[in-house]
Curated annotation (Swiss-Prot):
Transmembrane parts of this sequence: none
Annotated ranges, domain Myosin motor: 83-775
GO molecular function terms noted in the UniProt entry: actin filament binding; ATP binding; calmodulin binding; microfilament motor activity
Identification of the protein by name: Myosin heavy chain, striated muscle
Protein's job: Muscle contraction.
Organism: Argopecten irradians
Cited SMART domains: IQ, MYSc
Segments for region (Actin-binding): 653-675
Residues where ATP binds: G176, E177, S178, G179, A180, G181, K182, T183
Amino acid sequence: MNIDFSDPDFQYLAVDRKKLMKEQTAAFDGKKNCWVPDEKEGFASAEIQSSKGDEITVKIVADSSTRTVKKDDIQSMNPPKFEKLEDMANMTYLNEASVLYNLRSRYTSGLIYTYSGLFCIAVNPYRRLPIYTDSVIAKYRGKRKTEIPPHLFSVADNAYQNMVTDRENQSCLITGESGAGKTENTKKVIMYLAKVACAVKKKDEEASDKKEGSLEDQIIQANPVLEAYGNAKTTRNNNSSRFGKFIRIHFGPTGKIAGADIETYLLEKSRVTYQQSAERNYHIFYQICSNAIPELNDVMLVTPDSGLYSFINQGCLTVDNIDDVEEFKLCDEAFDILGFTKEEKQSMFKCTASILHMGEMKFKQRPREEQAESDGTAEAEKVAFLCGINAGDLLKALLKPKVKVGTEMVTKGQNMNQVVNSVGALAKSLYDRMFNWLVRRVNKTLDTKAKRNYYIGVLDIAGFEIFDFNSFEQLCINYTNERLQQFFNHHMFILEQEEYKKEGIAWEFIDFGMDLQMCIDLIEKPMGILSILEEECMFPKADDKSFQDKLYQNHMGKNRMFTKPGKPTRPNQGPAHFELHHYAGNVPYSITGWLEKNKDPINENVVALLGASKEPLVAELFKAPEEPAGGGKKKKGKSSAFQTISAVHRESLNKLMKNLYSTHPHFVRCIIPNELKQPGLVDAELVLHQLQCNGVLEGIRICRKGFPSRLIYSEFKQRYSILAPNAIPQGFVDGKTVSEKILAGLQMDPAEYRLGTTKVFFKAGVLGNLEEMRDERLSKIISMFQAHIRGYLIRKAYKKLQDQRIGLSVIQRNIRKWLVLRNWQWWKLYSKVKPLLSIARQEEEMKEQLKQMDKMKEDLAKTERIKKELEEQNVTLLEQKNDLFLQLQTLEDSMGDQEERVEKLIMQKADFESQIKELEERLLDEEDAAADLEGIKKKMEADNANLKKDIGDLENTLQKAEQDKAHKDNQISTLQGEISQQDEHIGKLNKEKKALEEANKKTSDSLQAEEDKCNHLNKLKAKLEQALDELEDNLEREKKVRGDVEKAKRKVEQDLKSTQENVEDLERVKRELEENVRRKEAEISSLNSKLEDEQNLVSQLQRKIKELQARIEELEEELEAERNARAKVEKQRAELNRELEELGERLDEAGGATSAQIELNKKREAELLKIRRDLEEASLQHEAQISALRKKHQDAANEMADQVDQLQKVKSKLEKDKKDLKREMDDLESQMTHNMKNKGCSEKVMKQFESQMSDLNARLEDSQRSINELQSQKSRLQAENSDLTRQLEDAEHRVSVLSKEKSQLSSQLEDARRSLEEETRARSKLQNEVRNMHADMDAIREQLEEEQESKSDVQRQLSKANNEIQQWRSKFESEGANRTEELEDQKRKLLGKLSEAEQTTEAANAKCSALEKAKSRLQQELEDMSIEVDRANASVNQMEKKQRAFDKTTAEWQAKVNSLQSELENSQKESRGYSAELYRIKASIEEYQDSIGALRRENKNLADEIHDLTDQLSEGGRSTHELDKARRRLEMEKEELQAALEEAEGALEQEEAKVMRAQLEIATVRNEIDKRIQEKEEEFDNTRRNHQRALESMQASLEAEAKGKADAMRIKKKLEQDINELEVALDASNRGKAEMEKTVKRYQQQIREMQTSIEEEQRQRDEARESYNMAERRCTLMSGEVEELRAALEQAERARKASDNELADANDRVNELTSQVSSVQGQKRKLEGDINAMQTDLDEMHGELKGADERCKKAMADAARLADELRAEQDHSNQVEKVRKNLESQVKEFQIRLDEAEASSLKGGKKMIQKLESRVHELEAELDNEQRRHAETQKNMRKADRRLKELAFQADEDRKNQERLQELIDKLNAKIKTFKRQVEEAEEIAAINLAKYRKAQHELEEAEERADTADSTLQKFRAKSRSSVSVQRSSVSVSASN
């Protein structure tokens, strides 16, 4: 880079090399110098002092303080040679600290531009720098990036050069947050392009005195105008653009500017009437109040004081560094340069001033009226004057606007708030329209009509904003920035890497985590924020609260980008309703007023008034939109009446993104250095945040790793083959080979480039080096070429001099000879006689020549006349030819249009057919729903009849109860006086109560309650009154239930009636649509026939036109030949004239005739005669040719006239057809209007439905949209009817193709019917299989009950064994050591029984292996069934596709769908039955688990007893040899028993897993229909947690094992010190070591099996999910589900049988073990050496059993979730039971009262008591019946409600299914990755534990070697152990505790 640093232009662009050398030579230690995090500076420079583990002590360079930081927090520091680096992609260490330091160091040195790979970073300097002058522009023009310091001009020049060389549109995206300097950089880019590519000025333009500037000046001066009207002061930026603009600068073929245009986006209109305290309105308001141009004050009627106007005095009035006076003058000058007239300027200023006066209009409320009135008219008159309207009309339109009610206009009163809002809306609308007009006017000036080839677009959009109060405008701005950032990320990170993959380059995809699509989808997708806002704007009663509720309902908790706002972090922060997570930060938004802002309402009366304004500009701004011409095309999308602000912004933003994607982008990232707007100050945290959000580091990384420069092979070969000409082989070679040879010839490093499929890719900077090499080679070649050219020119001049020299010598020689001959007399005579030889007969010849000349003149005139006629005819023919050619071209164009339209019509027809099919399917669904409702209605009517009957019975019962109550009241009055006598009769009452208990056992509980209540007779009266009150309450409740049932009945009847009416309307609409379709098909067929005829005519015309063209070409050739002949004759005539003149001269000189002259004259005469004859023949030929041409022309003219007549006839015929079609279209449109009205009625009726009919609403709305689309298509057809005649060939071809397809589809329909019949037969077969499954399930239930009984027997036997053990223990403790011999005998018996148990264990193992084989076989069968299900799904899918292709099969499909629906309901019922059975199976499994737990506890108790017994047996002093033998034998028996128990438990767990899988499969069928995808996510979360817990439990067990090994090592070390106490323990350790090895191997095998089972379960879940997703979309998949159920039931049956066999075996084992317990005491002496090993093994067994229990419980968690619904039903039944018990208690109280009455009145006798008792029983029975009926009624009501809710939610779930499935797939993929990562971590942990175990094993082996040395002391230990029993007992207890 050759830079003159003394040049002042580079002071703020490049660092002085002398200063930089000092900085680059500073001391540096790469191992010590580093960056550490710092709260204030972001990162601080430090030196590493020491390190300890993950913590490092560093010394801060700035203050010499020390600090301890983590190793991961330290970032590497670049060497000093990278100081103030211009391109950060060249850094050695790329990290945040280095980037921040480089930017800060350059910024503090005044260098604001830095390259960052492919884009440029610009830091706001907050001051003016002299780096944008013309001299700087000249220095950057045409320079490469590496030749000159970083600058914005370099980016602009690069874009310009790319446009010129690559012939591709370019764009400069200048992005950043608000206040980062985007607007200023945009102006500099435009200025640079205007200077570099300025067009050549004309002299007359330079000499003119007009104020209009050149095109470049106009482009530059457009910015001040737009800034005045579109920029304002905000809290972060004094000159913030409150609108977005995309400036396109167009260039011509030569690279010169050919024009420009500006597109604007989203002007912030709300700022016109409201600003925050620290902000300002738009600059133009303060400029017109600055008194900069005093003469305008009178025009605008403004006072030069901005504080007087309420619209602009809400914030600050002045801004630092902005002079409103000077800015207004610049703005006025810019208007002049842009060509605005004085009238246009004044009109704009008037409109601007009128907005100020609108803000001063005052209104007040009339007392006691809802009407406002004007509080003064001065400001209104000013507004009216400036806008050119009447003040009274303006006030009237504001205060009393007219609204249309029906067909009449009614005056509406406005209150004060409404009027003020209307004025504000008018001001905002006026300003918005004026701004848009200003942009259009500027574009008109910048449009030069010159030829445009390419353009460079410069984008300046309002930056990302986070204010204290963020509203709708901030959402739109931030949404735009989100899209632009996504474009940057996609272009930089995604497209770049995708191109590598596409080109076949070896590249590993890098995910930078910069995808913003989730946030964008949240805003713009259907049911996103903007979509919900637009939907709410269409509802008249919608408000901010309803909008907020919809947002929360759709997104809160469902999208992590949408959250509730946190607590305000700033004191001035306004209230917020939700918070979005944007790429630049979290922004809280307030939705207050969003609906009004989005609808942008305005008073239509004022609009109409302003449209008729006297001011031309105001009238133009508010003129009514022009109606489209009749038959013209209508715009797609919403009409202008419904075009909301969000929809317009989204449409314009999509257009902008489309433009950007079509260009080659260049990015400039603007950075805010600090919030204080101070130059030279860098806020590290703020800058780092912007770098992270903008993807700066990621952009640098991909620039360094990737290959940003690329060229296609042809361009590379053409441009760089000059560098290696010898490397290119001769002949044809493909571009890739040539490029590879060129690169090889240049000896380039292969790491610097890659060869793709079509392009060659280079690392950053490599292409610049190639350009430099090319320039050097070109300079050498040019120098050689210049040398060759100069040599050639010199040689050519030398040769010319030689030729001149030869010519001079020849001339000199001839002159010398002439000088010799000139005095010779014979020469003189010769020279005199020679002229006289040709003078003979000159006069005669002259006369003849004159005659010939006259004749030739006549012929020539005649020929000229004929020539003119022919030329005129030729011109006429050419014109006709051109007309015909134009007509042909028009016909061809219209044919192309018609072809497209025919294709669209065919597609539309297909769409309509599919829509009709969908409507028919929906009608079928609705008919099914109506049928269901009819059944429900009938059932409810029957229930109502029963209820009426029951209510009548209850009323009779209540009447009787009331009579009884009156009677009982009388009795109570008598009882109150006799309470004291009741104590004597208590015994008698008790005896009678016992007799009643014997008589009726059912009332035993109630009699017991009566005995209890007899003790509280003093409370009898209150209790009886309470019972009566409860009866009355029950009666009221029953009445209320009856009323509710009646209401529900009436409502259901009404709903059913309206549904039937809707169905009838839909059927009628369907029939009409079918009739229209048939009519249209007939019309199309007629049109096709017409088109065929006209096609033949057109083909004939085309052939004739081609013949005429050939004839015309022949005529043109003949005319050309005639012209050539005429020219030849003219030339001959001129030569003859010249010869005649020469003859005349010679005759004059000769004066006489000689014989020679006479002979010569004869020859001349003969020649003249010959010439004359030739002329006559030529004239005759010409005349013949002319006559032939005339004839041909006449024939051609006649043919053309005939063709024109035929075309006129065709035209008239087509116009007639057009009128007929138009009339038919009008009829069809009227019919569609009628259909629309019917549809509206249907919608009104449908809105009356409850939530169960919401799916009908959605479908009807779809139908309405399809009808609207049909209408729009019809309107387009009206405009396109005139061009239908030109679609003949394609229409004919398509008709033939359609006929073929129709025949093919008809054959496919027959195949589909046959396959459907086969499917029906298969379905019936499956139904039979399901019935068989029911029978199998009953058998399974019975077997489970039997297993439960056997389990209870086992438990009883175990309890008996425990009792026996306790007895033996107590007996042993009493008898002591005297029973040792008996224990030995019993031990031998126990050994025999243990051998038998070993045999049973082997048998159990064999059974387990058989079960495993059965499991694998069942798994294979399950996979086969899933394949069959997939095949069935595919066939059903194919049949559904075929079904949609035909209308004729609709009725057949309806019947089939109805049958499928009934089958689906039956399957659902069966599924519910299966679920109930599975609940019972689950209960049995829980009981099994309890029994297993009991067995485990019993096992532990036995082990404890053995432990105690061995402790006691240690006192016996038996021999070590016998103990060793017994220990080994028992150890083997224990291992075998434990293995058998583990295998049995594993088999049981497998069977439980099988049962659970079957249960989950059946439950998933119902859950998939009810709960859909959410349930699946919960299942996968549970599965993930279960697997995680399982892995954790295995890890814990391994860790516990390692810990146990460590404890064992400590114990061994302690026992080595005391060898006498360690002999038995060492043997146990040796045995324990072998056991541990086996245990570890077993654990490893279990881990592998667990992993395999996890993967297998995951695969099975994926397969099940796929099948269930298919079941959701197609009801016919129920056949596949039934097959799965059958397979599951068969598997459950096999599992049940296997478990039954295993249970029987287990029972046998338990019986054997129970019989063996009696012999345990005899074997206690030989169990002493096994205590420690058995205790360890038992602990491990317990750990494994606990893990198995946990896994089983986790597997049961899903089943427990399914039981929640059953529990809810049980709770409800409990409540009903409570009510029943209350009634029973009342009956009991009646019984007590009867007893008391009987006791108190002995006179009544037993007859009265019996009568009362019978009455009580009757009441009790009636109450029970009533409660039962009430419960049935409630159950039926719940079923009906559940069915209605299912119908309501089904449609919504189907619509959302696809999106949820996609999200679920993504989530599941992420979860699978997480699971894999967790499994890998678990494997690593297992490997670590295995290493620990091996280490422990090694230590154990060493301990064994040491133990061998202790054998010599074994005899001493035996003698010592016999003498000291107490020492042995203590040692054994210590080892047992360890």
